[in-house]
Amino acid sequence: MLRVMTSRNFLTIDDFDIRGKTILLRVDMNSPMDTQGHILDDMRIRSHIATLKDLESAKVVVLAHQSRPGKKDFTTMKPHAHLLSRYLGRQVTYVDDIFGTFAKTQIASMEDGDVIMLENVRFYSEESLERTTAEQANTFMVKKLAPFVDIFLNDAFAVSHRSHLSVVGFTEVLPSGAGRVMEKELISLEKGVKSGERPSVFVLGGAKVDDSLRVTENVLTNGGADRVLLTGVVANVALAASGVNIGKANLDFIKSQGYEDQIERARGLLAKFEDKIGLPKDVALNDNKKRVEAPISELNSDSLPINDIGLETIVDYTNEIQNAKTVVLNGPAGVSEIEDFALGTHEIIKAAIKSDFSIIGGGHISVEVAHLGLEHRFSHISTGGGACIDFLAGEKLPGVEALKAAYNKYQEAKKL
């Protein structure tokens, strides 16, 4: 079955003879939905088309989830199967079951080229429990489904930071590898944090201060970046840590988000990596939704809310970004949903596409990239969210570690 052709530490579709085989494919098609159950953005569904096209000679059983228990959009996979059929150009059969008799009968009766989508895997209570790979392999879902399939492929990078049943459990008992989405995510992000050409610049923003500081610490400690340019709320935290009086309104916002303790953490990073961390020289204040430029030196206790980086900072940052060979962007530079305060984010995006290798970490900045129509100008736009952040922060992702363990297991078997 195996024909290992990769020098990487995980298997891909190319390493398997898939013809006539039954493939269990874990994808991430979790999508925003309206109150009538209509999918509002099908980007994640479309992202898996390349994987499915490369599996046309096999029988494909799709495992996926939608939302989580308690949420209004926690619903069936029927609309996802419908859209997937449209984009794939062939029938994707929705199966109202996960591992019961009906699901197993449907799998057993499949022919080459067939694609079925099982029910929302989170309808099963054990799915979302965080447990070891061995423990997940000992669950009913794995025991019931594994005998009916030949190969497991994880194409759900966005949930691979969770040690969930359908993400890691099957890797213990089946030959396992990465789908095309997972493969591209791992190769691109690895290049972004380790093997990209220099100079390498990370531009971190948004409102998730702890995430940005985790990434900053990792890439500067391990040499993954030459410079980290801070924007957004994390820049405000770092400015406060550096001794700047950013104003009561901005400090109150930081406290309201639970990030007051991150000021001390930022202070430590600035002391350790002072010349490698870029801070704004000026900012844009929100005066009744009007943009007012202000140098850092003029900020005081009565300062208005900071909603963007200033014009001088935009010039400095974009010059540095344009001269970089590798650029990683995560999080907007300001309150980009308000037009006057989207300037910093938009200019940074436009500068990043001029680098040799550019990555968007996902989240709100991806929305702005799409708004500018520049998606195809980036080397990679991550679908990962929290998984992407954890990867950039140097943390091990259970789903990825499970694929590495499966690779090692079948490499050892090959030697026998």
From Swiss-Prot:
The record's similarity note reads: Belongs to the phosphoglycerate kinase family.
Protein name as it appears in the record: Phosphoglycerate kinase
Q: Which domain of life is it from?
A: Archaea
The UniProt keyword set, sorted, is:
ATP-binding, Cytoplasm, Glycolysis, Kinase, Nucleotide-binding, Transferase
Q: What are the leading ranks of the lineage? A: Archaea, Methanobacteriati, Methanobacteriota, Stenosarchaea group, Methanomicrobia
Cellular component GO terms held in the UniProt record:
cytosol
According to its UniProt record, the EC number is: 2.7.2.3
**What GO molecular function terms would the record report?**
ADP binding; ATP binding; phosphoglycerate kinase activity
Origin species, per record, is: Methanosarcina mazei (strain ATCC BAA-159 / DSM 3647 / Goe1 / Go1 / JCM 11833 / OCM 88) (Methanosarcina frisia)
